[in-house]
Amino acid sequence: MKGLDCGTGNFVAVDENGMRLQRNAFLTIDKTTTTTRQLNLLKVPYVEINNRLHIIGKKAYEYAQVFGNKELSRPMSQGLLNPTEQDAFPVLREIILGLVGKAEKEKERIVYCVPGKPIDKVQEVNYHEDVLKQIIDSLGYEARAINEAIALGLAGLQTAGLTGISISMGAGMCNLAIMYAGMSTLEFSVAKSGDWIDENVARDCGISSAKAQYIKEAGDYTIAPTSDVERTREQQAVKTYYEAMVRYLLSNIANQFASTSMPNFPDAVPIIIGGGSSMVNGFIDVFKDQFQQKQFPLEISEIKLVDEPLTAVARGCYVEAQLEEN
């Protein structure tokens, strides 16, 4: 059995042998005898389609940093399959195959995550869910989907009796679930997250989105509001758009709560946050600062990052796979 986080920015697989991660991205180059030979020699993963080579995963990200005029392509956009990328399906299949391989036994279970339906745009998740299931099933597995934020809650709310609010901040979407004793009472997503930050930083600072992402993830600075450490122009832009994103998320949460019948929790509940976009230094300080400026309809006991935020959703998928197996 395995858990698989199918994120816009990263795919993460978890099983009894540990965790494996791959960037959900590709870089397209023209095919020549020399480039094909070099990629094979260096064991760089790629897919050949229509006489073009798609370099896959982490290597694509690294190549994009070296060749500044090359933009990364994404099989997914805003949490779902990218409708502008005709080669998304074979690229995704190669990424998934590289992480989980082919099933070693018949109908081995894989629980994979899908986003909640976004509340700020008209878009369904059914096609996205079906395509991922088709790819996973084609490798000999039996695939079952779970909501991304619920998966995060299974990993991060265990000490709270699986009760609280889980927020998964990925590259394409922010997903939220309110859980009580392991059951979801409300789940949804908003279509602004890490990629939205990259796009705005890139536009305002005159750099590529790949460069903006690299700066955002570098980890050599903090976006904490109370920090007096000097930031570069690009780092300041990252801070600005993180604050804007959190404000947007909290406003949408408040609006959703106001229009939905809320559960009556007997005690204050925690908010736990995970996902790659939550890993920037000082993020939790930004979230707490913006949270304190809002009227929240539930009493909150604490706000914290889950352990290993990048792999938490995949771990929750694996927990669900284990529960189903038993």
Model regions: which residues?
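Gly/Ser-rich catalytic serine loop of serine hydrolases
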Residues: 170-172
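A structural feature that tracks compact, well-ordered secondary-structure segments
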Residues: 175-177
